[in-house]
Amino acid sequence: MSSRPLLHVRGRILTGPGRDDEVHDDLWIIDGRISFTRPVSGGNSGGPNEPTVLTGWVLPGLVDAHCHVGLDAGGAVDRPTSERQALTDRDAGTLLIRDAGSPADTRWIDEREDLPRLVRAGRHIARTRRYIRNFAHEIEPGDLAAYVRREARRGDGWVKLVGDWIDRAEGDLTPCWPRWAVEEAIAAAHAEGARVTAHCFAEDSLRDLVEAGIDCVEHATGLTEETIPLFAERGVAIVPTLVNIGTFPRLAAGGEAKYPRWAEHMRRLHARRYETVGAARDAGIPIFAGTDAGGSLAHGLIADEVAELVRAGLPTGEALSAASWGARKWLGRPGLTEGAPADLVIYPEDPRVDVRVLAAPRHVVLRGRVVR
């Protein structure tokens, strides 16, 4: 007999962004997997095989495509802290995390059926003294490709570069790598079967990274009329992390006395953040939801990030897809499909009407068990 309960989920099962054939009235969870066929032994007889009934509007487990488990402002954290981070995300409905760089070994999470699934990018790779202390491998351009190969093998199909950061001599954001180095590094990652993403706040690193074949850019606040068409043409995705970009004025205020050019630059990027994301969306650039939790940001903010995407001009269905159906497809993970692992979130109201519903899940089901 299975240790997982038989569950019957009724209401509006949203298997896609809105077509009639993507909305079902119910599904069953049998041995931890989804079925749209009523089980022979489950029914309304009141017998021992009677399913537990859950009702509401149902989405696949949400995706946070930029989230750092195992990291806080000081660097790597211990297992109990990592566990609390993952549980906070889980209880907010995030059941799939693309961990966009962490110095901690979190492989043990894979053995825990009560914690979200992680897609790791290894450890950040940054230029020497050009990133947050204790976060990254800090290296020089000649070593970049070798470190990328190592992190590609350590991760789950992704590698994370730091594409730009403050240059203390210049007093502003500048690219971290010469063009030849990123070309070698991205080719090395692709040869290992990994995709590459990069932290980029400013404008100047973007063209080299995209023309070198990068797959995704984090934050992407420096997109312009010149680079948006290039991203769209190459199909390069962005993860705007708008809840993080919202902290730019505070960061600017803290660094203004020492780096006034950088502070003013950060304020400009912040001021046009919604316009930038809206223009990217209009151009057809793939956009996915990520909170940048870890470091200095709290975990469990995926509902806030989806709401920010709506403020930036994404229609509600697209914003939901950026954190569910579309994000799962992008990461190669199943949604609400026959036979898929039962990772889903149930809400008391329709999130397609108001994405703020995401902030208050009624139930969270992970691997076929109700965990909230």
Regions found by a protein language model. Give the residues of each.
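Active-site core of metal-dependent hydrolases
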Residues: 169-275, 288, 293-296, 313-315, ...
